[in-house]
């Protein structure tokens, strides 16, 4: 434990809080246009073809968003809504594309966690 004298000489520094989703600019979601839709491979222990899209947001930022769920209808010039939330095994992917909103369709034949994938209640 430091003495009072030591604290006067070198005060305690509070850690800097860095923003994990700077492109949202303190908004819950942001709209954007897909500039490129493609697949990437995840980091070392995992193996897959993850669907991602490069999105130009309304505030001018260009970000990479993950497309969750099985199958999607996105292509270049699709208008999408983006939310925060990174994908742990994809470096540089800090955002998620919201399913069932604007040009993004919901996931077909989804029975559980439907609200997360924009799927309507089955009859």
Curated annotation (Swiss-Prot):
GO terms for molecular function: rRNA binding; structural constituent of ribosome; tRNA binding. The modification 3-methylthioaspartic acid is found at residue 89. The lineage of its organism: Bacteria, Pseudomonadati, Pseudomonadota, Alphaproteobacteria, Hyphomicrobiales. One of its GO terms (cellular component) is small ribosomal subunit. CDD domains: Ribosomal_S12. This is Small ribosomal subunit protein uS12. With S4 and S5 plays an important role in translational accuracy. Interacts with and stabilizes bases of the 16S rRNA that are involved in tRNA selection in the A site and with the mRNA backbone. Located at the interface of the 30S and 50S subunits, it traverses the body of the 30S subunit contacting proteins on the other side and probably holding the rRNA structure together. The combined cluster of proteins S8, S12 and S17 appears to hold together the shoulder and platform of the 30S subunit. Belongs to the universal ribosomal protein uS12 family. The streptomycin sensitive allele is dominant to the resistant allele in B.henselae. Part of the 30S ribosomal subunit. Contacts proteins S8 and S17. May interact with IF1 in the 30S initiation complex. The gene is rpsL. PANTHER family: 30S RIBOSOMAL PROTEIN S12 FAMILY MEMBER. NCBIfam families: rpsL_bact (TIGR00981). It comes from Bartonella henselae (strain ATCC 49882 / DSM 28221 / CCUG 30454 / Houston 1). It comes from the Bacteria. Keywords: Antibiotic resistance, Methylation, Ribonucleoprotein, Ribosomal protein, RNA-binding, rRNA-binding, tRNA-binding. GO terms for biological process: response to antibiotic; translation.
């Amino acid at each position: 434990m430091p003495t009072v004298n030591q604290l006067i000489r070198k005060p305690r520094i509070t850690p800097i809080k860095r923003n994990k989703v700077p492109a949202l600019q303190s908004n819950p979601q942001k709209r954007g246009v897909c500039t490129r839709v493609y697949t990437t491979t995840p980091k070392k222990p995992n193996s897959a073809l993850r669907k991602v899209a490069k999105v130009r947001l309304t505030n001018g930022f260009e970000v990479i968003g993950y497309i969750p769920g099985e199958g999607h209808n996105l292509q270049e010039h699709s208008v999408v809504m983006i939310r925060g939330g990174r994908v742990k095994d994809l470096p540089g992917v800090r955002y998620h594309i919201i399913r069932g909103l604007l040009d993004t369709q919901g996931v077909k034949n989804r029975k559980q966690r439907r609200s997360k994938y924009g799927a309507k209640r089955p009859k």
